[in-house]
Amino acid sequence: LTDTQKELVEGENADPDYFGRDTGDASKDDARNQDDIGDNELLVVSFGTSFNDSRVKDIKGIEDALQAAYPDWSVRRAFTAQIIINHVQARDGEKIDNMQQAMDRAVENGVKNLVVQPTHLMHGAEYDEMMEMIDTYRDKFESVAVAEPLLGEVGSDATIINQDKEDVAKAVTAAAVKEAGYDSLDAAAADKVAFVFMGHGTSHTAKVSYSQMQTTMQTLGYDNVFIGTVEGKPEETACENVIEAVKAAGYTKVILRPLMVVAGDHANNDMA
């Protein structure tokens, strides 16, 4: 922990709210920081979350699914958010590797073939930093492969869409419609229901990905589906602008859904 973080959690001036609400049982998680990796490693890189239940269900869920799909590879974990790593370790005693620690662990264990699977949504700042770290280690392995983030390549402007974005748009919309109790998106629209998928938002140039997702929804004919962002970048996806768009389209009920890999702080606090 940094000195500032230590002041929050230790001594007479400790902040009792630093760790916030009860977020579940951390013992159900698996930091996947074991040695004895073998020749082949599949490193799953996530931003991370301090919400234990969400970490177990979402991040661990992805890691477990990958391990089941590729039993001949050792799945390991790295988080890119050091503040979350520190938070979880101080509160729960769970030690999660950051990127450098995970890469060092792979080298020390003699890994020959490294595949990196990010759970990031887009080519944003966290993805860029991950790539910078990987590039410094490439000569330590016989082969290194890095997967695209969920939404694929960014593209130059809001009109550029790709198959990855279309697949995600179809999947998240179908799940939202079903869980809302409708047989179809048109049936929801007939009830004046709109679906708003909220992303994190970013000042990175990758922010255009959110606009591209809105373009994708429109291209698919999903007229009552809107893309918003918690932090309001890009401007057209800021909450106030999305609210105005929903009102202008005549919808009277909104169902909010996270456009995030993990339902952590933003989903539980900002959206709620």
Predicted regions: what is each one?
Residues 1-255, 260-272:
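Extended amphipathic ligand-handling, pore-lining, and cofactor/metal-binding catalytic surfaces
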